[in-house]
């Protein structure tokens, strides 16, 4: 009950605005103020690259829409980048209203809030004509914000590598009182664990890659072979596969499918 699988609206801005307003109304209408709750808000504007003209003014010059026919390796990405920034700006305004609603209800004092994304957007940073997402596993497409608000904790910035699958172990062990080892239910670790990662996996069940060390990208192709790139998406020839690390990664990837 209360789970919405679709949001009405003709545009991404209309849908994102409705998502924020529905959440605010839900917070204001809560009868049992002490009852724990979980909410998931998904904003789509930075994915859609679409805005009404009157909302596309904050960062200039900006494209009116994402004209993919004009993308090439030699173009200036600024107008496309500014369109993206304007979509983020509009969602930032909506997030401000969401946080203000939580403050008004006194919920910022006892609610963990996580702000992140499911992927990033690339704007040809590596000058290999990659744009948007879902075309490679470089940091420009998989690196996202990870911002936590935890009541009672001092603000702190971490610069070590984390992953989305660190979220559940952190919540379970640090805040929900789960005692058993995190390996029982997750590939992740605590967000605050600065131990260097020898590898991690990114992607989905069918389309994924292994990030080995700091900058080696081992991408599984549709044929089942591995293509290897460095951090700037330059193909790596004669790559010596670290067999032990790769074997461990494959076992971890499959162990929850028993």
Describe each region flagged by the PLM.
Residues 32-39, 107-113, 212-216:
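Loop/turn elements at helix/coil->beta-strand transitions in domains of secreted/extracellular proteins
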Residues 14, 78-90, 136-142, 153-169, ...:
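A short beta-strand-to-alpha-helix junction
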Residues 103-106, 150-258:
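Membrane-interface soluble catalytic domains
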Residues 103, 107-151:
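Histidine-centered active-site microenvironments of extracellular/periplasmic hydrolases
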Residues 36-44, 88-91, 95-98, 111-120, ...:
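Beta-strand elements within well-structured catalytic alpha/beta cores of enzymes
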Residues 20-28, 64-111:
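A long, amphipathic alpha-helix that forms part
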Residues 1-67:
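Active-site-proximal alpha/beta segments of enzymes that process anionic O-linked groups
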Residues 46-52, 121-125, 219-220:
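Short catalytic/ligand-binding loop motif for oxyanion handling, primarily in non-cytosolic enzymes
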């Amino acid at each position: 009950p209360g789970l919405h699988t679709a949001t009405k609206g003709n545009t991404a801005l209309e849908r994102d605005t409705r998502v924020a307003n529905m959440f605010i109304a839900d917070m204001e209408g809560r009868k049992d103020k002490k009852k724990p709750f979980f909410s998931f808000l998904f904003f789509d504007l930075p994915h859609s690259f679409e805005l009404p003209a009157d909302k596309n003014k904050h960062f200039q010059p900006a494209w009116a829409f994402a004209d993919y026919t004009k993308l090439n390796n030699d173009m200036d990405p600024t107008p496309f980048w500014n369109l993206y920034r304007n979509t983020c700006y509009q969602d930032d305004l909506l997030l401000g209203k969401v946080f203000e609603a939580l403050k008004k209800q006194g919920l910022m004092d006892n609610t963990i809030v996580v702000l992140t994304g499911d992927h990033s957007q690339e704007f040809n940073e590596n000058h290999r004509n990659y744009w948007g997402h879902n075309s490679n596993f470089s940091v420009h497409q998989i690196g996202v914000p990870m911002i936590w608000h935890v009541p009672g904790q001092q603000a702190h910035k971490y610069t070590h590598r984390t992953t989305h699958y660190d979220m559940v172990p952190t919540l379970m062990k640090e805040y929900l009182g789960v005692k058993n080892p995190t390996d029982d239910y997750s590939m992740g670790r605590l967000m605050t664990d600065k131990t260097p990662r020898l590898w991690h996996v990114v992607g989905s069940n069918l389309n994924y890659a292994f990030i080995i060390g700091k900058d080696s990208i081992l991408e599984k192709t549709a044929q089942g072979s591995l293509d290897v790139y460095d951090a700037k998406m330059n193909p790596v020839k004669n790559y010596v596969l670290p067999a032990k690390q790769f074997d461990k990664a494959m076992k971890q990837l499959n162990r929850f499918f028993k």
